[in-house]
Amino acid sequence: MPDPRQLMRDLQVFRDPQPGRSLWELGITLIPFLGLFATIIVAADAGYLFALALTPLAGLFLLRLFIIQHDCGHGSFLRNRASNDWFGRMLGVFTLTPYDCWSLSHARHHAMTGNLDKRGFGDVDTLTVREYCERSRTQRLGYRLYRHPLTLLGFGPAYLFLLRHRLPVGLMKEGWKFWISALGTNLATLAILAVPVWLVGFGVTLAVFLPTLLFAASMGVWLFYIQHQFPQAYWESKSDWSFAQAALMGSTHLDLPPVLRWFTGNIGIHHVHHLSSTIPFHRLPEVLKAHPALRDLNRYTAWESLSAFRLALWDEEQQRMVTFAEAKKMTG
């Protein structure tokens, strides 16, 4: 296994943002998204309902916009912090994600991932086997429902992007900045959506916007889930926790087909991203070329990732994720 700390030092050469390339990546994502979205709306309004079949494609472009917003949050899109922030806020209007709220939560996720004593910041709620057994029957049922794929990939993304992001949940007492971020994003999104509503009506706009957003949201949650929820994941108590170990061993390499790799902005190379989050998304493949040992480390294909949704609990004794059925056998 590569030494995580040495890798962090080696990866510094990939960290410098490339503004020209970044703006190009934004252009070839935002312009097609807007054009495709407008085309679907016009076609659907004209009665060509088959145009709605294109909403998943629009959703993929929206997902890529979120990845670019994600780079802004890490300061890896442009060289200037303020420029990163304002581009991130602009993109948040399209992704329905208040940038300042999300970027703080996501920074905490990076700082605390894999730490059993600091769970709950921008991650998928995960109990240990012992904690699950200590819960009441009602609490265990609630956790089972939460971990069900229908919740994680269906209700969860819808709740997160349609409802939770409308307010600075978790940050309500941390300053006006986060209220302005959430409410300002809401108003700006409504202002943009007012244009198609005025042109073709609320019904057609909703019929295009909702599936586009929900497809992108579900894809995003799928990516986020498999990035840290896999059999040999990394979880340690605070006294034994290591940032570098958590980054390298607690994150996967989701090896996707080239088209999906493009739409997901290479974020599947997640172990590298957690080791050095300021590497621009378009440079992550360069790291794999320079460090071939990272290719097969925690590597999963899209198909293999689906089995990870059976995992539900962290077993501290075996140091691995287990299913509810496996936990039941262990505890009797």
Stretch-by-stretch model annotation:
Residues 1-16:
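Short, Lys/Arg-rich, polar N-terminal cytosolic tail immediately upstream
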Residues 17-65, 93-96, 143-159, 175-223:
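Alpha-helical bilayer-embedded segments of polytopic membrane proteins, i.e.
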Residues 157, 191, 195, 202, ...:
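Cytosol-/stroma-facing membrane-proximal "stalk/adaptor" domains immediately downstream
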Residues 15-18, 267:
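Short, histidine-centered active-site or binding-site loop motifs used for metal coordination
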Residues 62-182, 232-320:
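Membrane-embedded catalytic scaffold of the fatty acid hydroxylase/desaturase
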Residues 221-233:
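Transmembrane-cytosolic junction motif
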